[in-house]
């Protein structure tokens, strides 16, 4: 697993807004260092590559993304990764917004029916489970997304 996310300056890397898929390519340089390139196919069918994307991102975002990638690679369940991210106390408003976006994206991959600890805020029952990326009470139907 690899998580690639972060805040980037508008003029540092242009990807057309209609591009929703692409590939991240890990390139090992002759000196042993790694760099990551982003490759996508444009509307005309041409392959485009943006080299060295890791140099473009804010270091804080990049480091958190590497940490999340590592715990996913070692098979930490996605719902536990979401809880880990949720527990981060970050000072910067931008990185808190980033944190919420990462949680929202990862929740889409939690298997339906996965139980969560805690009581439903509406009915008080301990019947919370993930459905379609949202935490849902199996007793009363209360649902919280995001």
Regions picked out by a protein language model, each given a short descriptive name:
Residues 1-146:
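Long, C-terminal-biased catalytic regions of enzyme "large/alpha" subunits
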